[in-house]
Swiss-Prot record:
Signal peptide: none annotated. Its cofactor is FAD. One of its GO terms (molecular function) is histone H3 demethylase activity. The gene is LDL3. Keywords: Chromatin regulator, FAD, Flavoprotein, Oxidoreductase, Repressor, Transcription, Transcription regulation. It comes from Arabidopsis thaliana (Mouse-ear cress). Residues 1-71, 1271-1317 are annotated as: Disordered. It holds the Pfam family Amino_oxidase. The lineage of its organism: Eukaryota, Viridiplantae, Streptophyta, Embryophyta, Tracheophyta. Residues 19-28 have a biased composition (Acidic residues). This is Lysine-specific histone demethylase 1 homolog 3. InterPro entries: Amino_oxidase, FAD/NAD-bd_sf, Flavin_monoamine_oxidase, Homeodomain-like_sf, SWIRM, TFIIS/LEDGF_dom_sf, WH-like_DNA-bd_sf. It comes from the Eukaryota. Belongs to the flavin monoamine oxidase family. Probable histone demethylase that reduces the levels of histone H3 'Lys-4' methylation in chromatin. Residues 43-64 have a biased composition (Basic and acidic residues).
């Protein structure tokens, strides 16, 4: 252009064809096309000549689309076609074109065009983008016009039509394009000149149609249909296409050559030539629906042709040629995988193709992601969303049955689904649009086959609440790249008012292109008309958002007299609040306090009953603003429904309530615990849904630890650990044997028994002779009630004392009370067979946690943007019961409140607590069906209360999260039985006492002060009256008498079952729906369960109101059938019967039967029964099948499945089995059970589980030592293959011969002991053994000399090790197995949390503590301990030579480190030390200590080296020093010590203990060296500052008792939390 345009050629990948000059002009076009269709190898060229005048010759690719014209036109010759193309030259130059808008088609001439400068800013204009210039206006693609833009010739001037017309300009010349994507970003200066719009060729096989580009107003443009109810807005200087892709030319720079910005979704392209003044050419191609289009016949070598409607200029008038469509079978491209192909999921990269990439003519993305990482992210995201990671759930089978029934579609679907879920999990705070998944918002004929699958999966995930859930919004905390190129709603204060979400299409995709600005009221039938002169806002908002804005609302007020009046609601500038309309959702999101206070304020002003109607908008009324109601309302509103929430309280949240006024800090008086914060992918357990909102808000969680010390109120001391562990194991066994008891006594009888009866019966069977245990005493005289416990057994407890002493009874009662806390009911009222029916679902994954700042922050965030009416006590709900009447009725439900207001809607969702339904506070008309009332009556609703105490200081053990207290009386066992230490959560000394069971039901019999006094009495008994100050503030709850809850949460009462949860949640007449925790059988009594039911019912309402199908009911039926297919108790009965059959047969038959059942057991109860039988088998028999790789894999699956609720007993038995069958470390590694034990079992909350795990680790370590000893000998046999040249060289050495004679016999003898079946050794092998033995003998002699010389040296004072050495300590701690030789009693662990009870009996516990952290990875292909001595030879010797400096209690180092590290065979990559390594070690040892070879070393055997004492000989029999440090080096105490040395010794003990705590985060690189040193210094200094002279004289273990260790651990944890950098959750 301007005579300076460079030649442009077709780049690789483009498919632009050119007619040859010598083509036969008389040849029919159809035959010509047929010939060109098969000339795929021919390369066409486009040449551009620069002369005095602009000349361009370009052939543009375009598929022909038939619109109804006969096929005769294809017989036109090329000559006639060229003649018609030329037409009237004057008409072309004058820019005559044909224009079509949504109202009609008009012809526009030059006289009708106006310059851009004169155009009205508020009109939709069309601009001609000319060369050497750019437009400063916004460009918009509107496919509805169906027109094309073409380039004017250089003589034409910029002009624009009126806003009612869209101009189409054609040109004789067309320009080619380069298929190159711009990658750099910068600003393009926009001039006043118009930028020329030109149609460009996009060489894509699925290119289709055209998109009209117009200019929008200066501020905003409207996308979508002209009559759309929702408008979308974008900042100026944006070019947008129909698929939702935006191009911001203001922020993008173009390279010096011609480039194209290509929309991968709809093939929208923008062409720019920087060499000509930055002109931008924009074009998109769509399906052939346009009635005005130029002829462009460009065949794709692998595609078929379609005819397009063409518009030809003829004497200044547009003409249209409609050509028939030629339909032929598509040929598959060789480089593409189509829908249904097996490799579809492997080549699908649609979710990773979000950035600009070079286009090479293929639809596949050029980005190859990290497959394994993306797959893991997708699977974790699927589990987090509540789906299965690698299989299809029942809901997917029902909804997507058409998609899944194709061959190979399951795997394709899973890949697609997990990819979309993983994409959203990377930023859960924003709404993921479908366009970011690589497809357009709507289907098209020429899109990839996978696009329909992606769109269908996205629609399913979005509508079912698996993505874009919680409080996600368009403007998330970290917006995606597609949302960073522009600002939404320029000029608006988004931080003050963000717009609500509205579904923009039936695809269920909201906010793909932008935020909703207004809901256009184009229909005259709408009764609510809102007038706003300045802004088009919808709904009624608070005065903060409607200042100086007047509005008029005409609506029908429904009152007691059923009068209809017209009301003008004018905004008063002095008014503080304005009531929101109940039947329109609020568009704005003001502060929650303002939103809620507005409803209360206007209720007092009598303006609270103004329902507004919008035609064709479904209205849903939600009763209750708890977690379930808010979650449902939010999902319904985002899907385009009008939602009104009615709440009886003056606040939102329901039973979630954070008190911010009674104490100095906010405290949760209702729900307070998130019952699972992490997705457990192996067991497919999702986290609590409230965690999603916490992540979206960035809330900080306080993770709870499982250790709960138990105090006895009678003695005022801790319950002995041995007794506590024994009784806890006994109680867990009783709980797990409940299912067996049910099978034993029969279901009919068991259904009439309570859980307490079953536990007492099981306890008697364990403690009493069988002839004295009578089941008839249980369950017959019982009578449950709603208020407390009834029956003779709670009145007379003397019969229980026959087999339990008083202390045991108090401890057992505490465990009973803890179970009552889980059920919120007395055990006498809980069903025996169904009390834990939710165990089948496993609960939520991850540890429990509390929210800093309170749980109300979650529900308050859910309430933002919703139309909530507070203080609305619902009294009556009327619904249409007749189906025929329902079809004729405009409104199906009517909700009335106590103040006379009524609300009409299409559906009502009842989320009130079960206690309110039991109390019948809401009257239903007609009454609820009998089956609904039966479930309401049968299910139980329990009570849990709290006594919150705030103290001036902390007097309890602040390192624990909770502690228990026994009760003297059985009836009062649940009163203040547990105290929650919430100091680290709330930041103040606060304890929360729990009141459950009978004490909670009799709660009202005492006053608030009496409850506080009782809690204080218990605390003073536990900690001493003088140490417990009076509380500075207190709060007492009483949920049982709350008129809006009547309790805490639900439980399965006697006579009920888990199916009652489903029955309670079923809808009535498809217009009355129920949600809440009492309708969630999977997760009852949890906030997460309530939120899940809210989404469930919202989805059900959407399905019924839109399609009339209740897919949720189908899912429940399918799941019920699946549960019956694997009946729990039927499997137990089958196991028992089969074992009874072979009881009298031979032993081998029984063992074979157990083996078969071991590999086929499916249920937890069946596995538990089988595990008990397996433990009775002989060890070798059990090891023969359970110790193999397959058997260990089965045990691994059992352990993973037992990590859910109430699986402790099965887990305990599995670990016992592992202790007995472990004999092959290789099989252990291959099965994956080592990792499971390390990550799951070692971190288990149960103390007895950790104690058993310690025994298992001992077994593994012993087995490892034996295997290593054997491998050392066997590895020497292989040395000749790698060191042949070196061996031959040394064979000729006389030293080698002599060394061989010294030890060859011993070596052979040792080899024969371990390898009886080995072949005779060759001469070279013997030489290797001789060399190694010689080196060993020399090293032992040197070590012995060093040891004897060291004994004679004067003792030195211990030195406080430098922190640099402590940071390096892990090197010599890893050198060999000497650290692992230190055994510890297996029954010591379990007193406290792994490291809490380190005393003289378990001083070797460091081995156990380090093992799960990083010392032994049993899943690796090699045991990494073999490699621990490899990293640095020099560092190893320095560490060993100065090892005594690193021991806080020693004056003489344990010489086993010296002999074990290099003398023993092991530690190299091949499992042995060669002579070079030994020589190197000797030279380094001599360099470190010149007297090394002049000393004698006292060598002890392996077991003695575990605790060897290297002090002076005269002290040989002195008592061994107490050890509690990381070094674990044993020393003899000196007879004379001063306070300085004692202080150093204590300080060293503290340093060692702190090092043990910091080693794990340091090795995990969560803290660096500086933080390590800083925490070490601070901790040691603080501890020693508070140490008295009397304490300095104590032994280390006496000084570091459990209480002091807990304080140190808590201090270290706080320091680590302070310094550790917490990574952002991708969410995960």
């Amino acid at each position: 252009m301007d005579g300076k345009e460079k030649k442009s050629g077709s780049k690789r990948g483009s498919k632009v064809f050119q007619f040859d000059d010598d083509a036969d002009d008389d040849e029919p076009i159809g035959s010509l096309l047929e010939i060109m269709k098969h000339k795929s190898s021919k390369k066409d060229k486009v040449e551009t000549e620069s002369t005095g005048k602009q000349r361009q010759k370009q052939v543009v690719e375009k598929k022909l689309s038939a619109l109804g014209k006969d096929s005769e036109d294809m017989d036109d010759t090329l000559a006639s076609f060229r003649k018609r193309l030329k037409g009237n030259k004057k008409g072309v130059e004058s820019g005559t074109s044909r224009v079509r808008n949504h109202e009609g088609v008009d012809t526009v001439t030059n006289s009708n065009l106006k310059p851009i400068e004169e155009a009205n800013k508020n009109e939709v204009q069309s601009v001609l983008l000319r060369e050497n210039g750019a437009s400063n206006s916004i460009q918009k693609c509107a496919s509805e016009t169906g027109t094309l833009l073409h380039k004017f010739s250089g003589k034409d001037k910029a002009a624009s039509p009126s806003h009612e017309k869209v101009e189409t300009v054609s040109s004789e010349k067309e320009a080619d394009v380069f298929h190159q994507i711009t990658k750099e970003e910068s600003e393009i200066p926009m001039s006043e000149k118009a930028v020329e719009l030109s149609r460009v060729s996009v060489p894509m096989p699925d290119v289709h149609g055209e998109v009209n580009c117009t200019i929008a107003p200066d501020k905003h443009i409207h996308l979508g249909e002209p009559t759309s109810e929702s408008g979308y807005y974008r900042e100026k200087n944006l070019v947008m296409c129909d698929c939702g892709t935006q191009f911001n030319f203001e922020d993008r720079s173009f390279e010096s050559n011609t480039q194209v910005t290509l929309c991968q979704k709809c093939k929208y392209s923008s062409h720019h030539n920087a060499s000509n003044g930055g002109g931008i050419q924009v074009n998109t191609l769509e399906d052939g629906t346009a009635q005005a289009s130029p002829v462009s016949i460009i065949p794709c070598e692998d595609e078929n042709f379609r005819g397009d409607a063409i518009s030809l200029p003829n004497s200044g008038k547009p003409s249209t040629l409609q050509r028939p469509e030629r339909i032929a079978k598509k040929r598959k491209l060789g480089n593409m995988v189509y829908e249904g192909d097996v490799k579809w999921e492997n080549e699908q990269g649609f979710l990773d193709c979000q950035s600009d990439k070079s286009f090479k003519g293929s639809d596949k993305c050029g980005f190859v992601p990290s497959i394994s990482k993306e797959i893991e992210i997708g699977r974790a995201a699927a589990v987090t969303a509540g789906l299965k990671a690698q299989s299809v759930s029942p809901i997917e089978k029902i909804i997507l049955k058409e998609v899944l029934k194709r061959k190979g579609s399951n795997q394709e679907y899973l890949v697609c689904r997990n990819s979309i879920l993983g994409l959203w999990s990377k930023n859960v705070s924003r709404i993921l649009p479908v366009t970011e998944c690589g497809v357009t918002g709507g289907p098209s004929e020429s899109e990839l086959p996978s696009a329909s699958l992606i769109r269908e999966v996205y629609k399913f995930l979005d509508q079912r609440g698996y993505i874009n859930a919680g409080i996600s919004s368009v403007n998330g905390k970290a917006a995606s790249s597609t949302n960073q190129d522009y600002d939404l709603l320029q000029g608006r204060q988004l931080e003050e008012s963000s717009m609500a979400s509205v579904a923009d299409s039936e695809e269920g995709v909201a906010f793909i292109l932008g935020q909703v600005k207004a809901v256009e009221s184009t229909s005259e039938g709408k009764k609510c008309a809102l007038q706003n002169d300045e802004r088009d806002l919808v709904g009624c908002a608070t005065s903060e958002m409607l200042e100086s804005i007047s509005k008029k609302c005409e609506a029908s007020i429904i009152d007691d007299n059923k009068r209809s009046v017209s009301m003008n609601a004018l905004q008063d500038s002095t008014a503080s609040n304005v009531e929101k309309h109940p039947e329109t959702f609020s568009v704005a999101k003001p502060a929650l306090s303002s939103t809620l206070s507005s409803a209360h304020s206007n209720q007092m002003r009598g303006r609270d009953c103004v329902p507004c109607e919008v035609i064709d908008e479904k209205k849903v009324i939600v009763i209750g603003a708890g977690p379930a109601g808010l979650t449902a309302a939010r999902h319904l509103q985002r899907q385009g429904f009008s939602v009104t929430v009615l709440e009886a309280r003056s606040r939102v949240g329901g039973r979630v309530f954070t008190d911010r006024s009674s104490l100095s800090v906010p405290v949760d008086l209702g729900a307070s615990i998130i019952t699972g914060i992490e997705a457990d992918v192996p067991s497919e357990r999702m986290p609590d849904p409230s965690v999603l909102v916490c992540n979206q808000l960035g809330l900080e969680l306080s993770v709870l630890h499982g250790f709960c010390p138990l105090y006895d109120t009678v003695t005022g001391k801790k319950v002995p650990a041995e007794l506590d562990d024994a009784l806890q194991a006994e109680f867990n066994s009783l709980i797990d044997d409940v299912d067996l008891l049910v099978e034993e006594i029969g279901k009919e009888r068991a259904n009439k028994m309570s859980l307490e009866d079953g536990l007492e019966y099981g306890l008697q069977r364990l403690r009493m002779p069988h002839d004295k245990v009578n089941i008839d005493k249980f369950g017959l005289l019982n009578s449950s009630s709603k208020t407390g416990i009834r029956g003779p057994f709670m009145q007379d407890e003397s019969w229980k004392d026959d087999f339990l002493n008083p202390l045991e009874r108090r401890v057992m009662n505490w465990h009973f009370a803890h179970t009552e806390y889980g059920c919120a009911a007395v055990l006498k009222e809980v069903s025996l067979p169904h009390w834990n029916q939710d165990e089948f679902y496993g609960g939520f994954g991850g540890p429990h946690a509390m929210i800093k700042g309170g749980y109300s922050r979650v529900v308050e965030s859910l309430a933002e943007g919703l139309d909530i009416h507070l203080n609305k006590i619902v009294s009556d709900v009327s619904y249409v019961s007749d189906v025929s009447a329902m079809d004729n009725s405009k409104h199906k439900v009517r909700v009335s409140t106590s103040n006379g207001c009524e609300y009409l809607g299409d559906a009502v969702l009842v989320t009130v607590p079960l206690g309110c339904l039991k109390a019948e506070t809401i009257k239903f008309s007609p009454p609820l069906p009998d089956w609904k009332y039966a479930s309401i009556k049968q299910l139980g609703f329990g009570v849990l209360n709290k006594v919150v105490l705030e103290f001036p200081t902390v007097f309890w053990d602040d390192s624990v999260d909770y502690f228990g207290a026994t009760a003297e009386e059985t009836d009062l066992r649940g009163e203040c039985f547990m105290f929650w230490n919430v100091k680290k959560t709330v930041g103040a000394p606060v304890l929360i006492a729990l009141v459950v069971g009978k004490a909670a039901f009799e709660y009202t019999n005492k006053s608030k002060s009496e409850h506080v006094n009782h809690a204080m009495m218990v605390l003073r008994k536990l900690f001493g009256g003088d140490l417990v100050p009076d509380p500075v503030a207190s709060v007492v709850t009483d949920w049982g008498t709350d008129p809006y809850s009547y309790g805490a949460y639900s439980y399965v009462a006697i006579g009920a079952s888990g199916e009652d949860y489903d029955v309670l949640g079923r809808p009535v007449q498809n217009c009355l729906f129920f949600a809440g925790e009492a309708t969630c059988k999977e997760h009852p009594d949890t906030v997460g369960g309530a939120m899940m039911t809210g989404v469930r019912e919202a989805v059900r309402i959407i399905d019924i109101l839109r399609s009339g199908n209740d897919y949720t009911a189908e899912i429940e039926t399918l799941e019920k059938a699946q549960r019956k297919s694997v009946p729990v108790r039927d499997e137990v009965r089958d196991l028992i019967k089969r074992l009874e059959v072979v009881e009298l047969s031979n032993v081998l038959a029984r063992q074979s039967l157990l083996r078969n059942m071991f590999f086929s057991a499916k249920t937890t109860v069946g596995r538990l029964h089988l595990a008990k039988e397996l433990l009775n088998l002989p060890g070798e028999t059990l090891k023969s099948f359970a110790g193999t790789k397959e058997g260990l894999a089965v045990l691994n699956s059992w352990i993973l499945d037992s990590m859910g609720k109430n699986g402790t007993q099965l887990l305990r038995h599995c670990v016992h089995i592992l202790v007995r069958v472990t004999s092959d470390l290789f099989a252990l590694r291959l099965s994956g059970i080592g990792k499971t034990v390390k990550e799951k079992v070692c971190a288990h909350t149960s103390r007895d589980i950790r104690a058993i795990a310690s025994q298992l680790v001992n077994v593994w370590l012993d087995l490892y030592r034996k295997e290593k000893a054997n491998s050392g000998k066997k590895s020497l046999r292989q040395a000749n293959t790698t060191n042949t040249s070196r061996i031959r060289r040394k064979l000729n050495s006389p030293d080698t011969d002599s060394k061989g004679k010294l030890s060859n016999g011993n070596d052979v003898k040792t080899d024969e002991e371990f390898e009886d079946n080995q072949l005779p050794m060759s001469e070279e092998e013997k030489a290797v053994f001789a060399e190694a033995e010689a080196a060993r003998a020399a090293a032992e002699a040197a070590a012995k000399a060093f040891s004897e010389a060291y004994h004679n040296t004067s003792l030195q004072l211990p030195k406080i090790p430098s922190f640099h050495k402590f940071a390096r300590r892990e090197q010599y701690a890893k050198m060999d197995e000497s650290d692992f030789r230190k055994k510890f009693p297996g029954n010591v662990l379990g007193r406290q949390d792994c490291m809490s009870e380190i005393d003289s009996r378990n001083c070797k516990v460091r081995d156990w503590y380090d093992f799960p952290a990083s010392c032994l990875d049993l899943d690796s292909a090699r045991i990494p301990v073999d490699n621990y001595s490899q990293p640095s030879h020099s560092n190893e010797l320095v560490s060993h030579s100065k090892f005594r400096e690193c021991s806080g209690e020693s004056v003489a180092a344990d010489t086993s480190f010296l002999t074990g590290a290099w003398v023993d065979t092991g530690g190299s990559s091949d499992g042995f030390k060669d002579s070079q390594a030994i020589d190197r070690w000797q030279s380094q040892a001599a360099a470190a200590d010149p007297e090394f070879f002049n000393r004698t070393l006292h060598i002890k055997d392996e077991e003695d080296s575990i605790a060897c004492s290297t002090g002076p000989p005269s002290w040989k029999h002195d008592q061994r020093a107490n050890e509690c440090s990381v070094s674990q080096v044993t020393v003899n105490k000196e007879p004379h010590k001063n306070h300085i040395r004692s202080a150093d010794r204590l300080k060293q003990g503290v340093v060692d203990f702190v090092a043990s705590l910091l080693m794990a985060p340091y090795r995990a690189k969560k803290i660096d060296r500086d933080v390590y040193k800083s925490i070490m210094k601070k901790t040691a200094t603080k501890v020693m500052q508070h140490t008295t002279d009397v304490e300095k004289a104590m032994a280390v273990t006496q000084f570091l008792d459990s209480k002091r260790k807990n304080k140190i651990r808590d201090f270290v944890d706080k320091q680590v939390d302070k310094y550790m950098v917490i990574p952002q959750v991708p969410k995960p």
